[in-house]
From Swiss-Prot:
<keyword id="KW-0645">Protease</keyword>
<feature type="transmembrane region" description="Helical">
    <location>
        <begin position="232"/>
        <end position="252"/>
    </location>
</feature>
<feature type="transmembrane region" description="Helical">
    <location>
        <begin position="161"/>
        <end position="181"/>
    </location>
</feature>
<dbReference type="InterPro" id="IPR014032">
    <property type="entry name" value="Peptidase_A24A_bac"/>
</dbReference>
<keyword id="KW-0997">Cell inner membrane</keyword>
<keyword id="KW-0378">Hydrolase</keyword>
<feature type="transmembrane region" description="Helical">
    <location>
        <begin position="185"/>
        <end position="205"/>
    </location>
</feature>
<dbReference type="InterPro" id="IPR050882">
    <property type="entry name" value="Prepilin_peptidase/N-MTase"/>
</dbReference>
<dbReference type="GO" id="GO:0046872">
    <property type="term" value="F:metal ion binding"/>
</dbReference>
<dbReference type="GO" id="GO:0005886">
    <property type="term" value="C:plasma membrane"/>
</dbReference>
<keyword id="KW-0479">Metal-binding</keyword>
<dbReference type="GO" id="GO:0004190">
    <property type="term" value="F:aspartic-type endopeptidase activity"/>
</dbReference>
<dbReference type="GO" id="GO:0006465">
    <property type="term" value="P:signal peptide processing"/>
</dbReference>
<dbReference type="Pfam" id="PF06750">
    <property type="entry name" value="A24_N_bact"/>
</dbReference>
<keyword id="KW-0862">Zinc</keyword>
<dbReference type="Pfam" id="PF01478">
    <property type="entry name" value="Peptidase_A24"/>
</dbReference>
<feature type="transmembrane region" description="Helical">
    <location>
        <begin position="261"/>
        <end position="281"/>
    </location>
</feature>
Length: 290
């Protein structure tokens, strides 16, 4: 930590460069999490289903599948991805977005996640003073990136990410983080109850589900990290971003009105903005409108 402080004050360009490069590698790992975690959960659910409803069915012995095993490979030709082909961002550019084995296109989202993770991390490093708070904010940022893309893909916010994020926020603030422990606990409770109440009010009025329970847990986690004071701005920003994005998708005819839109990404975006600039936005609003 002392070395980071010296770099940040003496050689800020080197400090930000190291944050960028390290976060590119984190983004590469997040791609693995985004792709594999839903598959791991699906396999787990299938195994639980068999154990409850078909206890005599032993199923098929499947090879291990987790975040480390098996080795990453091309989904089209099973060409194993070598170390040189797995350099964040650069490998995709070097391969021109195609598999070295079969020349099948590689989704541009892989380098996008890596670059987005790196840029958001640099923004955190430039906005917050170097210290444990910056490291905690980086961790929060990385988990929010993973949750955003999983929800976009699968309409799912896994408990395996939201619950550790919630407890991590409480623990961080217990140790003297962004807010007091009392504010963090109230933030977690209020975050969950607000969306839970909206969910049931909407369901009673329309008979439809407006959001999932993962959204409750994500807002609770943001409340645990940022305190209850940040919840109004998180809800306001997420609603505004969600409304603009939803209207834009409908106008572009890329989205049918009856098709659900994941709310988790908008909560994640709003939570990240509140993390860095929530106090400034609140002061600006109070100064100009109240």
């Amino acid at each position: 930590m002392a070395l980071l402080l010296e770099l940040a004050h003496g050689l800020p360009w080197l400090y930000f460069s190291l944050v960028f490069l390290f976060s590119l590698m984190i983004g590469s790992f997040l791609n693995v999490v985004i792709h594999r975690l839903p598959i791991m959960l699906e396999r787990e659910w299938q195994a639980e289903y068999r154990s409850y409803f078909n206890p005599d069915d032993e199923g098929v012995d499947e090879p291990p599948y987790n975040l480390m095993v098996p080795r990453s490979c091309c989904p089209h030709c099973n060409h194993p991805i070598t170390a040189l082909e797995n350099i964040p961002l650069l490998s995709w550019l070097w391969l021109r977005g195609r598999c070295r084995g079969c020349q099948a296109p590689i989704s541009a989202r892989y380098p996008l996640v890596e670059l987005l993770t790196a840029l958001l991390s640099v923004a955190v490093a430039m906005t917050l003073a170097p210290g444990w708070g910056t490291l905690a904010a980086l961790l929060l940022t990385w988990v929010l990136v993973a949750l955003t893309f999983i929800d976009l893909d699968k309409m799912l916010l896994p408990d395996q990410l939201t619950l550790p994020l919630l407890w991590g926020g409480l623990l961080f603030n217990l140790l003297g983080g962004f807010v007091s422990l009392g504010d963090a606990v109230i933030g977690a409770m209020a975050g969950y109850l607000v969306l839970w109440s909206l969910y049931w009010a909407f369901k009673l009025l329309t008979g439809k589900e407006g959001m999932g329970y993962g959204d409750f847990k994500l807002l609770a986690a943001l409340g645990a990290w940022l305190g209850w004071q940040a919840l109004p701005i998180v809800l306001l920003l997420s609603s505004l971003v969600g409304a603009f994005m939803g209207i834009g998708l409908i106008l572009l005819r890329n989205h049918h009105q009856s098709k659900p839109i994941p709310f988790g990404p908008y909560l994640a975006i709003a939570g990240w903005i509140a993390l860095l600039w929530g106090d400034s936005i609140t002061r600006w609003y109070l100064t100009n409108f109240l």
